[in-house]
C-alpha cells in the first residue's frame, strides 16, 4: 500500500512594510518589490514551495497589498482539481479593528485557515529572501524528529553573526537557546568559527503550533513575534531543532550557489543581490531549469540591440531596446529603453524606464516608469542626488522612486 502523504498547509508571511527599502516600498508591499528583471520577491518562496510539492498556500498580507494581491491572483493560478491553491489573505481583524501586532499575531488571527484545513503540519516561511530550497526535505526531517518545531538555519561566519537571530544548538541539532543579535554569538559544535543564523523559515506540528499561538496571544509581555516569542517557547520546552540549510540538496544547483541565501531588506543588500546575478558564473543562478523560479513573464517581444554599443555582464528582460550605449553589470527590467551614447553601470533598471541620449546612470536603482532625460546624471554626484530628493544608501546606491522624471 502506498504511503499516505501528510496534510500540509503552507503559510507565507507577507505583511511587512519594508521601511528600509524605501522608496521602493512607497506604493507596494515589500514582497511585491521587483527582483531580477522579471520577478517579484515573493516568487522565490512560492517557487520553492511549489517545486517541493507543497501547493496549498495561504499568503498573509497587510500593508499596501494591492500590487501583491494582484500579482498572486494573476501569476499563481494553480489547478484546483487536486486541491492546489495560492491565495492572498488580507488582515481580517477577527479580534477587533486593529492591524496585526506581529508575525505570530498574524497567524493567530488566521487560525481559521488551520482549523478549516486541519493539516498534520504547518509550514511558515517568510516572503522576501532570495534562495532555492527543497522544503519537502526539511519537512521530512521535521517529521522524523517527532518534535513540535523545526527552524531552518544557515551557517554564517561567527564574526558576522551578530547581525542575525542566532540559534544555539547541540551536536544533535536540538536547539538550546534562541538569541536575538547577540554580541558574542556561539559557535557550532562542528565549526567553532561559524554560527547558525535563523532563516525565518519554520515547520510545526499543528497541535503544537496552535497551542503556542494561544499561549503567546494571552501573554501580556509578548511582542507576538514568531522568532522572538513563539520559537523560544518551543526551545524552553526542549521541543525545537535546527535544520542545517547546508544539507538541503536542490536539483540543478551548482556548488557555488548550493547554500545561497540573501536577506534583501536594505537598499544595499538588494543592490548586492542583483550584482550576484550578472557574473559569468553568478553567485545565484537564475538559469536552473531543474528548479525554476516561476512568475508571469511580460508579454513583450525579445530584447533588441541596435547601433552597436556594448553590453557586458548584464541581464536583459523582454521588450528592451538598447541603442548604441554602454551597459555594464546591470539588470534591465521589461521594456526599458536606453538611447545612444548613454552609460549605465552597476545599476537596477525596472519596467518601462527610459534613459536618454548621453545620460549617465551609475550604481543606481531606477524604479518603474522613471525617465532620465538626455544628458542627465544619476549616481555620479551624491550631494546633487540628495538635493533632488533621491535616496542615497550608506553604501552609495542612489534610488529614484517610481514615475519620477529626473531633473538636471
UniProtKB/Swiss-Prot annotation:
Q: In which pathway does it act?
A: Glycan biosynthesis; glycogen biosynthesis
Per the record's keyword annotation, is Nucleotide-binding included, yes or no? yes
Q: Please provide, alphabetically and separated by semicolons, the GO molecular function terms listed in this UniProt record.
A: ATP binding; glucose-1-phosphate adenylyltransferase activity
Under Pfam families, the record lists: Hexapep_GlmU (PF24894), NTP_transferase (PF00483)
Q: Which Gene3D superfamilies match?
A: Hexapeptide repeat proteins, Spore Coat Polysaccharide Biosynthesis Protein SpsA, Chain A
- Keywords associated with the record: ATP-binding, Carbohydrate metabolism, Glycogen biosynthesis, Glycogen metabolism, Nucleotide-binding, Nucleotidyltransferase, Transferase
Q: Which InterPro entries match?
A: ADP-Glc_PPase, ADP_Glu_pyroP_CS, GlgC_bac, GlmU/GlgC-like_hexapep, NTP_transferase_dom, Nucleotide-diphossugar_trans, Trimer_LpxA-like_sf
Q: List positions binding alpha-D-glucose 1-phosphate.
A: 100, 165, 180-181, 198
One Gene Ontology term from the biological process aspect of the record: glycogen biosynthetic process
Enzyme Commission number(s) from the entry: 2.7.7.27
> Which transformation does this protein catalyse, written as a reaction?
alpha-D-glucose 1-phosphate + ATP + H(+) = ADP-alpha-D-glucose + diphosphate
Biological role: Involved in the biosynthesis of ADP-glucose, a building block required for the elongation reactions to produce glycogen. Catalyzes the reaction between ATP and alpha-D-glucose 1-phosphate (G1P) to produce pyrophosphate and ADP-Glc.
Q: Could you say which protein family the record assigns here?
A: Belongs to the bacterial/plant glucose-1-phosphate adenylyltransferase family.
What interactions and quaternary structure are annotated? Homotetramer.
Q: Which HAMAP family match?
A: GlgC (MF_00624)
Protein name (record): Glucose-1-phosphate adenylyltransferase
